[in-house]
């Protein structure tokens, strides 16, 4: 039987994950910096897992196994976020300051707000993104969390950062077109990669600030 302490912590974490940041901050005005980081990591993990599961389901359903490797090595799989100076892994991320990592994470998140806003109109059969109508809200929620962390680290006066002028294309609604399938496949691949980066950056920041045993990832 699960001990009362860990069980209570798990239930609290789940409850906070279901709340938007405005409610979290309102309910816990004195939330510590470690609490803000913990919630941001939790939300990023949830979105990354959702993106990974969706990519796998889309791939399994629409992309023949023999074509997957070749497609992933074409321009279709190129993510324009790779053109910004973002660390590609944990070791590179550790060379950046927390504010640099937060700004990069913000750029990655904001580049997807447009494409994901009407995602439920694309996958209307609920084959993938069963909760697609909430993906945009979850992404906005994470954006608010990152902005909250930036305000904390910048003493409430965030500086103007780099503006990502380009965003990803919208998902194609014509699922019977091979070109549309390839485009959506590439977008889902990029979404998964960008959420993995964001989760990695947030975990690196949280671990090096608070030195937790779970830092080995």
Curated annotation (Swiss-Prot):
Task: List the GO cellular component terms.
Answer: extracellular space
| Major localization class | secreted
Q: What are the alphabetically sorted keywords of the record? A: Disulfide bond, Hormone, Metal-binding, Phosphoprotein, Secreted, Signal, Zinc
Listed result of changing residue 153 to V: In 30% of the molecules
Keyword Iron in the entry? The reply is no
Task: Fetch the SUPFAM superfamilies from UniProt.
Answer: 4-helical cytokines
Where is Zn(2+) annotated to bind?
46, 199
S-S pairs: 79-190, 207-215
Q: Which GO terms describe its molecular function?
A: growth factor activity; growth hormone receptor binding; hormone activity; metal ion binding
Among the Pfam families in the record, one is Hormone_1
Q: Which Gene3D superfamilies match?
A: 1.20.1250.10
Cellular location(s): Secreted
Phosphoprotein among the record's keywords?
yes
Q: Where on the chain is Phosphoserine found, per UniProt?
A: 132
Q: Which residues form the signal peptide?
A: 1-26
Which GO terms of type biological process are on file? animal organ development; cell population proliferation; growth hormone receptor signaling pathway; insulin secretion; negative regulation of apoptotic process; negative regulation of fatty acid biosynthetic process; negative regulation of gene expression; negative regulation of plasminogen activation
Family assignment from sequence similarity: Belongs to the somatotropin/prolactin family.
Question: What's this protein's function?
Answer: Plays an important role in growth control. Its major role in stimulating body growth is to stimulate the liver and other tissues to secrete IGF1. It stimulates both the differentiation and proliferation of myoblasts. It also stimulates amino acid uptake and protein synthesis in muscle and other tissues.
Q: Which PANTHER family match?
A: SOMATOTROPIN (PTHR11417:SF2), SOMATOTROPIN,PROLACTIN (PTHR11417)
Name it: Somatotropin
This chain's source organism reads Bos taurus
């Amino acid at each position: 039987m699960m001990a009362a302490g860990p069980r209570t912590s798990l239930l609290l974490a789940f409850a906070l994950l279901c709340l938007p940041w405005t409610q979290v901050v309102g309910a816990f005005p004195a939330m510590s910096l470690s609490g803000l980081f913990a919630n941001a990591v939790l939300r990023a993990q949830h979105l990354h897992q959702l993106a990974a599961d969706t990519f796998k389901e889309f791939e399994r359903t629409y992309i023949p196994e023999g074509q997957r490797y070749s497609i992933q090595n074409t321009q279709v799989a190129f993510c324009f976020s790779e053109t910004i100076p973002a660390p590609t892994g944990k070791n590179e991320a550790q060379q950046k300051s927390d504010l640099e990592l937060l700004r990069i994470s913000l750029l990655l998140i904001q580049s997807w707000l447009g494409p994901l806003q009407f995602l439920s109109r694309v996958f209307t059969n609920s084959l993938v993104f069963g909760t697609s109508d909430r993906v945009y809200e979850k992404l906005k929620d994470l954006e608010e969390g990152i902005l909250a962390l930036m305000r904390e680290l910048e003493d409430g006066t965030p500086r103007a950062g780099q503006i990502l002028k380009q965003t990803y294309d919208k998902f194609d609604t014509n699922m019977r077109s091979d070109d549309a399938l390839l485009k959506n496949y590439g977008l889902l691949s990029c979404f998964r990669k960008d959420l993995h980066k964001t989760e990695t950056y947030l975990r690196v920041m949280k671990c090096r600030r608070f030195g937790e045993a779970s830092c080995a990832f």
